[in-house]
Every structure is written in structure tokens, then in C-alpha cells.
């Protein structure tokens, strides 16, 4: 398992809509994320800057690089494109974050 983190940007005034859409995330998308090796995925918001900070844990043999090929993933990105910053192909703009510190319980 490894953990990655990245930053995205939410458009102003879209917090409630972003939360609503994620509360109603499509079961097919959840299944595809799990099948790709995603084991834990959390997104946090800095309300002052509208930056979203995502932390994702995935299996060592993950296949996340194939997610953009999936119709349901593309459909989700199209669905989210009106409320966040995206590239011309409607994928969310993401900036990888560099890990600087980790604290784990000795039993891990």
C-alpha cells in the first residue's frame, strides 16, 4: 500500500454542490475505483483558498493509470467540470503534493 496526496481547486461558491455530488457518488464509479486498487480516499477543503486536498491510499498493484480510459470516470469528470478547475479535456487540474512527515502507530 502507498499513499498519495494532491491538490485540486474548487470554484467559488461550489462547496455545497461538491459535497452533494460526492454524497451521491455513483456506485459504478465506486466499484471501478475499488477495482483499480483505491482503498481509502479522502478530500479536504481549505475554505479560504478553495483548494481541495486529496489523500488516497492504494494497493501496490493498483491500476489507477487506467482510470481515464473508463467511460464512467470520463462521465464523472464531465459531471464535475462545471464546479472545479479542469484541463481542456475536463480532467480535474491536479498538483501532486510532496510527503514531508508521517507518523504511524508502532503496530502498523
From Swiss-Prot:
InterPro entries: Dimeric_a/b-barrel, L-rhamnose_mutarotase, Rham/fucose_mutarotase. Its EC number is 5.1.3.32. Keywords: Carbohydrate metabolism, Cytoplasm, Isomerase, Rhamnose metabolism. The active site is at 22 (proton donor). Substrate binds at residues 18, 41, 76-77. The keyword Cytoplasm applies. Pfam families: rhaM (PF05336). One of its GO terms (cellular component) is cytoplasm. Disulfide bonds: none annotated. Pathway: Carbohydrate metabolism; L-rhamnose metabolism. GO terms for biological process: rhamnose catabolic process. It catalyses: alpha-L-rhamnose = beta-L-rhamnose. One of its GO terms (molecular function) is L-rhamnose mutarotase activity. PANTHER family: L-RHAMNOSE MUTAROTASE. This is L-rhamnose mutarotase. The lineage of its organism: Bacteria, Pseudomonadati, Pseudomonadota, Betaproteobacteria, Burkholderiales. The gene is rhaM.
Amino acid at each position: 500500500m502507498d499513499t498519495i496526496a494532491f491538490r485540486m481547486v474548487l470554484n467559488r461558491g461550489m462547496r455545497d454542490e461538491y459535497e452533494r455530488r460526492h454524497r451521491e457518488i455513483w456506485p459504478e464509479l465506486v466499484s471501478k475505483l475499488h477495482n483499480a486498487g483505491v482503498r481509502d480516499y479522502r478530500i479536504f477543503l481549505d475554505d479560504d483558498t478553495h483548494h481541495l486536498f486529496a489523500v488516497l491510499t492504494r494497493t501496490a498493484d493498483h491500476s489507477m493509470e487506467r482510470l481515464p480510459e473508463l467511460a464512467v470516470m470520463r462521465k464523472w469528470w464531465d459531471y464535475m467540470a462545471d464546479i472545479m478547475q479542469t484541463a481542456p479535456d475536463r480532467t480535474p487540474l491536479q498538483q501532486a503534493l510532496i510527503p514531508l512527515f508521517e507518523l504511524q502507530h508502532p503496530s502498523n
